[in-house]
Amino acid sequence: EEIESLAVNISGIKRIRFFMTFSESYLTHLKCLEDVGMTSIEPVMYGGQEIIPLQFLKTLLPDPASLGPRTKGKTNIGCIFVGKKNGKEKKLYIYNTCDHQECYKEVGSQAVAYTTGVPAMIGAMLVMNGTWRRPGVFNVEEFDPDPFMDALNRFGLPWKESHDPVLVD
Protein backbone atom coordinates (compact mmCIF):
# COMPACT_ATOMS: atom_id res chain seq x y z
CA GLU A 1 0.00 0.00 0.00
CA GLU A 2 2.05 2.91 1.30
CA ILE A 3 5.35 1.76 -0.11
CA GLU A 4 4.01 1.38 -3.65
CA SER A 5 2.86 5.01 -3.90
CA LEU A 6 5.96 6.34 -2.15
CA ALA A 7 8.21 4.58 -4.67
CA VAL A 8 6.26 6.14 -7.53
CA ASN A 9 5.82 9.65 -6.12
CA ILE A 10 9.19 10.40 -4.52
CA SER A 11 12.03 10.55 -7.02
CA GLY A 12 15.36 8.93 -6.27
CA ILE A 13 14.06 6.18 -4.02
CA LYS A 14 15.95 2.95 -4.64
CA ARG A 15 14.58 0.74 -1.88
CA ILE A 16 11.64 0.88 0.52
CA ARG A 17 10.95 -1.73 3.18
CA PHE A 18 8.03 -2.01 5.57
CA PHE A 19 8.08 -4.17 8.66
CA MET A 20 6.33 -4.68 11.97
CA THR A 21 7.47 -6.44 15.11
CA PHE A 22 5.46 -8.59 17.49
CA SER A 23 6.23 -10.12 20.87
CA GLU A 24 7.49 -13.69 21.05
CA SER A 25 4.30 -14.66 22.91
CA TYR A 26 2.09 -13.23 20.16
CA LEU A 27 4.04 -15.04 17.45
CA THR A 28 3.94 -18.33 19.39
CA HIS A 29 0.16 -18.12 19.77
CA LEU A 30 -0.30 -17.25 16.11
CA LYS A 31 1.96 -20.12 15.03
CA CYS A 32 -0.01 -22.55 17.20
CA LEU A 33 -3.32 -21.39 15.67
CA GLU A 34 -1.80 -21.70 12.21
CA ASP A 35 -0.45 -25.19 12.95
CA VAL A 36 -3.91 -26.48 13.92
CA GLY A 37 -5.57 -24.86 10.90
CA MET A 38 -7.47 -22.09 12.70
CA THR A 39 -6.09 -19.32 10.46
CA SER A 40 -7.24 -21.05 7.28
CA ILE A 41 -9.80 -19.46 4.96
CA GLU A 42 -10.53 -22.81 3.32
CA PRO A 43 -13.96 -24.22 4.31
CA VAL A 44 -14.07 -27.36 6.47
CA MET A 45 -16.94 -29.52 7.65
CA TYR A 46 -17.78 -29.28 11.36
CA GLY A 47 -20.88 -30.85 12.89
CA GLY A 48 -22.47 -31.20 9.47
CA GLN A 49 -21.88 -27.52 8.69
CA GLU A 50 -19.32 -25.96 6.41
CA ILE A 51 -17.33 -23.36 8.33
CA ILE A 52 -14.28 -21.25 7.64
CA PRO A 53 -11.84 -21.72 10.54
CA LEU A 54 -10.65 -18.10 10.60
CA GLN A 55 -14.23 -16.80 10.73
CA PHE A 56 -15.02 -19.26 13.53
CA LEU A 57 -11.90 -18.16 15.42
CA LYS A 58 -13.01 -14.54 15.09
CA THR A 59 -16.24 -15.37 16.96
CA LEU A 60 -14.18 -16.73 19.87
CA LEU A 61 -11.68 -13.89 20.16
CA PRO A 62 -12.41 -10.74 22.17
CA ASP A 63 -13.91 -7.76 20.38
CA PRO A 64 -10.92 -5.55 19.45
CA ALA A 65 -12.76 -2.55 20.94
CA SER A 66 -12.63 -4.28 24.34
CA LEU A 67 -8.83 -4.50 24.33
CA GLY A 68 -8.13 -0.82 25.01
CA PRO A 69 -8.25 -0.90 28.81
CA ARG A 70 -5.80 -3.81 29.06
CA THR A 71 -3.39 -3.01 26.22
CA LYS A 72 -0.07 -1.88 27.67
CA GLY A 73 3.19 -0.68 26.19
CA LYS A 74 3.97 1.66 23.35
CA THR A 75 3.88 1.85 19.60
CA ASN A 76 6.85 3.07 17.61
CA ILE A 77 6.23 4.29 14.09
CA GLY A 78 9.09 5.72 12.13
CA CYS A 79 11.01 6.14 8.93
CA ILE A 80 14.73 5.62 8.47
CA PHE A 81 16.21 7.56 5.59
CA VAL A 82 19.61 6.70 4.13
CA GLY A 83 21.13 8.67 1.28
CA LYS A 84 23.29 11.60 0.32
CA LYS A 85 22.82 15.26 1.14
CA ASN A 86 25.23 17.79 -0.30
CA GLY A 87 27.45 14.88 -1.40
CA LYS A 88 27.74 13.38 2.11
CA GLU A 89 26.24 10.10 3.31
CA LYS A 90 23.41 10.78 5.77
CA LYS A 91 21.10 8.70 7.95
CA LEU A 92 18.00 10.09 9.64
CA TYR A 93 15.34 8.42 11.75
CA ILE A 94 12.06 10.30 12.24
CA TYR A 95 9.71 8.56 14.66
CA ASN A 96 6.83 8.76 17.09
CA THR A 97 6.15 6.68 20.17
CA CYS A 98 2.65 6.45 21.56
CA ASP A 99 1.56 4.94 24.89
CA HIS A 100 -1.47 2.62 24.79
CA GLN A 101 -2.66 3.54 28.30
CA GLU A 102 -2.33 7.30 27.70
CA CYS A 103 -4.36 6.97 24.50
CA TYR A 104 -7.01 5.00 26.34
CA LYS A 105 -7.28 7.72 29.00
CA GLU A 106 -7.67 10.38 26.29
CA VAL A 107 -9.99 8.72 23.77
CA GLY A 108 -11.04 5.30 25.11
CA SER A 109 -8.96 3.40 22.57
CA GLN A 110 -5.47 1.96 22.35
CA ALA A 111 -2.55 3.51 20.47
CA VAL A 112 -2.94 1.49 17.26
CA ALA A 113 -6.35 3.08 16.64
CA TYR A 114 -5.04 6.47 17.80
CA THR A 115 -2.05 6.41 15.45
CA THR A 116 -4.39 5.47 12.59
CA GLY A 117 -7.13 7.99 13.32
CA VAL A 118 -5.13 11.12 14.13
CA PRO A 119 -3.18 11.21 10.83
CA ALA A 120 -6.40 10.56 8.88
CA MET A 121 -8.07 13.44 10.73
CA ILE A 122 -5.11 15.71 10.00
CA GLY A 123 -5.21 14.84 6.30
CA ALA A 124 -8.95 15.58 6.16
CA MET A 125 -8.41 18.85 8.04
CA LEU A 126 -5.69 19.97 5.60
CA VAL A 127 -7.95 19.22 2.64
CA MET A 128 -10.95 20.95 4.24
CA ASN A 129 -9.05 24.11 5.26
CA GLY A 130 -7.54 24.40 1.77
CA THR A 131 -3.92 23.73 2.75
CA TRP A 132 -3.91 20.60 0.59
CA ARG A 133 -6.10 21.55 -2.32
CA ARG A 134 -5.60 21.22 -6.05
CA PRO A 135 -7.60 19.63 -8.84
CA GLY A 136 -7.26 15.89 -9.23
CA VAL A 137 -6.53 12.92 -7.02
CA PHE A 138 -3.31 12.78 -5.03
CA ASN A 139 -1.58 10.74 -2.35
CA VAL A 140 -0.47 12.56 0.79
CA GLU A 141 3.21 12.38 -0.14
CA GLU A 142 2.46 14.57 -3.16
CA PHE A 143 1.59 17.52 -0.89
CA ASP A 144 3.78 19.78 1.25
CA PRO A 145 4.60 17.64 4.31
CA ASP A 146 5.35 20.53 6.69
CA PRO A 147 1.73 21.37 7.64
CA PHE A 148 1.06 17.67 8.26
CA MET A 149 4.18 17.19 10.39
CA ASP A 150 3.39 20.36 12.38
CA ALA A 151 -0.16 19.14 12.99
CA LEU A 152 1.10 15.76 14.24
CA ASN A 153 2.87 17.65 17.03
CA ARG A 154 -0.24 19.68 17.85
CA PHE A 155 -2.68 16.78 17.83
CA GLY A 156 -0.96 14.27 20.09
CA LEU A 157 1.58 12.48 17.90
CA PRO A 158 4.82 14.42 18.42
CA TRP A 159 7.73 13.18 16.39
CA LYS A 160 11.43 13.14 17.08
CA GLU A 161 14.55 12.98 14.96
CA SER A 162 17.60 10.82 15.50
CA HIS A 163 20.58 11.73 13.35
CA ASP A 164 22.97 8.92 12.43
CA PRO A 165 20.85 6.07 13.89
CA VAL A 166 22.30 2.58 14.23
CA LEU A 167 20.82 0.44 11.45
CA VAL A 168 19.95 -3.24 11.77
CA ASP A 169 19.86 -5.44 8.68
Stretches with model-predicted labels:
Residues 1-169:
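C-terminal catalytic/substrate-binding lobe primarily of soluble NAD(P)-dependent oxidoreductases
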